[in-house]
Amino acid sequence: MEQITKPHCGARLDRLPDCRWHSSMFAIVAFGLLVCWSNAVGGLILAQLKALGWTDNSTTATFSAITTAGMFLGALVGGIIGDKTGRRNAFILYEAIHIASMVVGAFSPNMDFLIACRFVMGVGLGALLVTLFAGFTEYMPGRNRGTWSSRVSFIGNWSYPLCSLIAMGLTPLISAEWNWRVQLLIPAILSLIATALAWRYFPESPRWLESRGRYQEAEKVMRSIEEGVIRQTGKPLPPVVIADDGKAPQAVPYSALLTGVLLKRVILGSCVLIAMNVVQYTLINWLPTIFMTQGINLKDSIVLNTMSMFGAPFGIFIAMLVMDKIPRKTMGVGLLILIAVLGYIYSLQTSMLLITLIGFFLITFVYMYVCYASAVYVPEIWPTEAKLRGSGLANAVGRISGIAAPYAVAVLLSSYGVTGVFILLGAVSIIVAIAIATIGIETKGVSVESLSIDAVANK
């Protein structure tokens, strides 16, 4: 039987010049993230259901909580399945679950049935997000992987304003009885297009195939990619610089995430995402209430909130420009310190002008960190053999903090006012900054294989 040599897919992918192939991988993943907005339409759907008498405050809380619970389970279990079945198969599977639950949910006869569908939507979405963000890093070269991942985050985060604009256009045209159903069918149809694109044009990750010892399949996919790049560029490919040791891949059991180097990365990734969830979700959900606590009326609170939130796409755009110019550890620590300091200063303001200006810059830095944490740093720190499981576990832990944070904010806002809330956010930011500085690893410009060798060898 012919001996099949290790194809060294990582080194071969990293030497590819930027071309249409990278852009096509980016476009498919970015489009998939942009249109999977079942979570983004949650508030819009609840408003319609309230008008129909389907929901009250208690049911609304259940609807929201069940979504978070589903995303928690999806992140946890989805990573396990994704590392077992592959990136392409996981992409298509989780899209199918998400689409089916949205379509079935759109025809729900009552609120209980819709809540059950909402849980499944959360499972599919939680698994899909882990797969797309983490899996995407295996296709991009180490030299500008952060820039590509930031671009994906930039496009994906337009889902919130996009679905809101669609809802604004539909509301005067469709009755409330059908409006909320259409709000679910639109992302389902668009996600079906994303699935078709993935089925037709998205190859399995050669790095994943190689990590499973499937050398022949990895070589076939890799050759197809290389031939396409040569056709697109019209130039021969640069020589391959092999960074790994040529040894056969090692199996990495789930238990390896709970010991040694991989445990340290679980702690690191969880801390990074805890800061993201606590800061981001607190500001998104509580900012209008915080404004009103400061004595600003409801109308002005909404205006201030809207103006501040323009910092979100601006922040991700800036992150996209600088991501591969600043070391990852330096960027994470720097952003968290800026958020802590600026948040405290923000809490002391009473002038509408200063609240608007400082709020804009605060949200800008927060969303630079969101891009850094969810799209770049946490997906990067895992070996290919355990990438989706590690990322999924860290995401699941991060989501727990997102569940607990609103209760802490409510207590602090009632007892200590706005300053108390921002002291909490600042404390979380500083603690995580210290964690990144002490146990963080540098991933800027580092090949996936270098990270894998270190982690797997010391698992």
Curated annotation (Swiss-Prot):
Gene3D superfamilies: MFS general substrate transporter like domains (1.20.1250.20). SUPFAM superfamilies: MFS general substrate transporter. Pfam families: MFS_1 (PF07690). Residues 1-25, 82-90, 134-153, 203-271, 323-329, 373-399, 442-459 are cytoplasmic. It is a multi-pass membrane protein. It comes from the Bacteria. Keywords: Cell inner membrane, Cell membrane, Membrane, Transmembrane, Transmembrane helix, Transport. One of its GO terms (molecular function) is transmembrane transporter activity. Its main location: membrane. The chain crosses the membrane at residues 26-46, 61-81, 91-111, 113-133, 154-174, 182-202, 272-292, 302-322, 330-350, 352-372, 400-420, 421-441. PROSITE patterns: MFS. GO terms for cellular component: plasma membrane. Belongs to the major facilitator superfamily. Sugar transporter (TC 2.A.1.1) family. This is Putative metabolite transport protein YdjK. It comes from Escherichia coli (strain K12). The gene is ydjK.
